[in-house]
């Protein structure tokens, strides 16, 4: 009988853009360790479409686990019990660690988040601009509207054009 070879796949389960970008050093480390590119299933496939360490990008909504050898998400590495922990033992405040450092032993020089955007030659952008994304997934990361306004006004006064990013709504 012929057994179909399944592809290795790394699942980036975060729906937030920032957390997804922070997973890019992990992808590079895994690819270098295994000596091959692999598939990535994610909520934001655009982030990985030109990444040289990724063979194929799959939108997580259409992801079929049966076709892939699953490699854990970077947020679940070392997770022993997905149903929870009955008792607390040796509790550590994990907020002291960077998310991409958990379980992958990344060296400081390996922690740079790399982004490989598609070439946009036809898009004529000014030479000095900054993108501002005032919408966050988590309430604890939300900055007051007044603070965003102050930042944007300060940038504008310095001659820097501001491009606002965010959700459609």
Label the predicted regions.
Residues 1-169:
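Catalytic machinery of carbohydrate-active enzymes
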């Amino acid at each position: 009988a012929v057994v179909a070879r399944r592809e290795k796949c790394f699942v980036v389960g975060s729906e937030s853009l920032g957390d997804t970008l922070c997973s890019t050093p992990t992808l590079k480390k895994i690819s270098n360790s295994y000596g091959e590119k692999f598939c990535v299933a994610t909520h934001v496939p655009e982030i990985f479409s030109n990444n040289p360490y990724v063979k194929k990008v799959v939108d997580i909504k259409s992801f079929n686990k049966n076709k892939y050898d699953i490699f854990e998400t970077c947020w679940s590495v070392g997770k022993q019990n997905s149903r929870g922990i009955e008792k607390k033992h040796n509790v550590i405040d994990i907020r002291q660690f960077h998310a991409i450092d958990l379980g992958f032993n990344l060296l400081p020089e390996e922690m740079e988040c790399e982004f490989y955007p598609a070439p946009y030659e036809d898009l004529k952008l000014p030479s000095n601009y900054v993108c501002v994304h005032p919408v966050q997934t988590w309430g604890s990361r939300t900055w007051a509207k007044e603070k965003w306004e102050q930042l944007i006004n300060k940038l504008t006064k310095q001659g820097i054009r501001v491009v606002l990013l965010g959700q459609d709504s």
